[in-house]
Each structure stands twice: as structure tokens, then as C-alpha cells.
Amino acid sequence: MKFVFTLACLLAVRCFADDPVAAWSKDVRIKPVSSVEGRHSIHTYYVTNPESPDGKHVLFFTSTHPAGYVGEVRILERATGKETVLAENVHTEDAHRAACQQWLSGGKRVAFHEVIDKKWRVVVVDVATLEKKIVAEDHQVGFGRPDVDLLPMYGCHWNPGPFRDLEVWDSKTGQTTTRAKIAEVEAKYGEWLAKEFAGKPCSVFFPVISPDLKRVFFKIAAGNGGDDFMAKNASHRQGLVCYDFEKSACIWQHGKWGHPGWTPDSQHIFEMGNVIFDIHTGKYTKLKDVPVLRGSHPSVSPDGKLMVTDGLTEPVGGRPNDWGIQVADMHGGKWAVLHHFEQNRGARSWRRNDPHPVFSADGKRIYYNTSDSQFTRLMVAERP
């Protein structure tokens, strides 16, 4: 009997190894991260994991404001549900990415940005002491890696002033350095910039550092000036540029922004449409036999075997306007939809909140937002 049980376990392990989607195909537990009701709870974006590097806490933004514009940056202890407020009265650009809150320094710190009287600043909080440090003004924050000390920043996309380059703050040294200049982008891709942005001054926007810390990708913005950031036409934002820190050079450019994200090997970018770009050659491939969901924000599991995305679910049998969370094999062919839900309620932000799903570091959980009721809620799906 013991032999039969052991054999069954080995076969199950082999099945999951051959088919990484299998573990997500049944008995997946889905629940809100927090049991507290009567407020929005929002994970920021699909390029950053809200779970702390040690897996003990979850980071999110909460708000009772109808549109989610003002609230608190909090962490929740997964084992007990206890919440700690890291920052309060935080004013945001929208409920789409909230405060861009993210882990830093192996979980010792949390970074976010906020606006006070129309002046933006980047803030870092020491999780143990709750001490806050303003590391930059007239800047917003991009996305670094939770296990290291580097935090990318950029000038406000609608009116960057003199801050048009990519800057990186190092929590170890407390120093900020310029790591990529918009002038380098202009020198290499000037013809594209002139065509896309009609000759308007441009700046680096929304940088995301690669897992190996050797590269960064970013979008380009041409601001319309002023201080009205709550508007779609505050700036024109488009394109994708990949920059190599070691070479101090732009190495790749794509004319459209398609919700890109790094793959774990730092050699590829995966984006909506199930497209995988090789950053060295610019060539791309698509996942075979995996339905494409419209409006998706895809991200890849830490082991590189799976992708998760959100999107409208009609291509997979969903009702019109229903959204869902889809997991798929990065080799193509196998996929599963974990959750169908409405996404037309929640925070009444001028830029709507999207689910923005992302895996935990161990690949066993997926975090995402839903807006199927009065409040936007951060959910977690956990496989057996």
C-alpha cells in the first residue's frame, strides 16, 4: 500500500512537471487578501509582486475615497491578518496604479510616490521603524526589484521640467545617479521620436529594471505642461526602449507599448497578445494555441514556466464585458481560467483600476484586483 501511495505521488509530481497548468486547473482557493470591508484594497501593477520577499506580508493601498485617490499604504501579515499602516493621507494620480507601492531592500523598506499640493515626491519607509525618507521631489517612481536596493525614478510625465532622464536611488548609499539619458534615446531613435511625438520634448517614463539588474525598459512621454495630471491628454506616452546599464547604451526599441514585462532570464520581454520579444535581436514569437484576452496585463512566473494575465473573457467562453484571470504554459497549448468577474464597478477613478495579476515569488499564489462590487478588492488565488 505504501508503494502504491509513493508511486501515485511520483506520478502526480511528474504530471505537474510536464504540465505546469495542471496545478492551477482545480481546487484553487480564491479569497480577498484582507477581511476588512468598506474600503478599496489595491495591488499596484503586474510588474511587481505585492508579497514580501520572505513571503510573510502583503503590501497594498487602501482607500475609502469613492475614486481611490486618497488612502493608506499598508502591509498585512499573512499568518494573522494583522495590518500595519506605513503611510497615511497618501494622494495618488489615479486608482489604476495607486501609489506605485513596492518592496525594496529585501523587504526592509517600502517605496511609493505621492502628491501634496500638486508637488510630487518619492518616499521610502523603513518597515521596522516606520521612519519615512523623502528621496526625491518633482519625481515619480518606476519599478525596481524587491530583493535589492535600487529604485528607478523619473520626472513627472506631463511636466518633467529638468528631470527628463532615468535616475536610480540606492538605499545603501543614499545616492541618486543618472543611469540613462533621454539624449541617448534621441541620438539613436531620433527619427522615430520625431514621427511619434511631432518634435515635442520627450522624457523617460515608467522604467522597469530587469531581474538581473543589468537592463531596464521604459516608455517615452511628451508632456503637455501644466499641473493637471488627472487627464488622458496630460502627456503623449508611447513606445518601448530597452537600455543596457553595462553597455551604457540603448539596445532595442519597439514603436508600441503593449504592457510589457520581463521574463525571469532578463533576455526577453513578454507582452499583451502573448508575444515574446528577444531584446538582442528584436525578433518575436507568440505562444501557440493560447487564447488572447483583450486588455491584458501579462506576467511570467518566477520559474519561467507559466504566464498569468487578465482580460476580457469572451474568447474563452465568458460573458460580454466579463474579465478573468488566465494561466497558461509558456510553451503554449495549455491554459486555464481561474476566475471570471465583472470589472465595471469598484474605484471610480478617471483611469480605471485593472486586475494586474502577478505571481508570488514561490509561484504558488497569484495576486490581482477585482472591481465587481462597490469597492475594488485585492484577491489572492492559491493552488493546492
State where each predicted segment sits.
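Hydrophobic h-region of N-terminal signal peptides that target proteins for export
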Residues: A8-A17
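Sequence signature of WD/YWTD-type beta-propeller architectures
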Residues: D18-P384
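Sec-dependent signal peptide recognition
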Residues: M1-L7
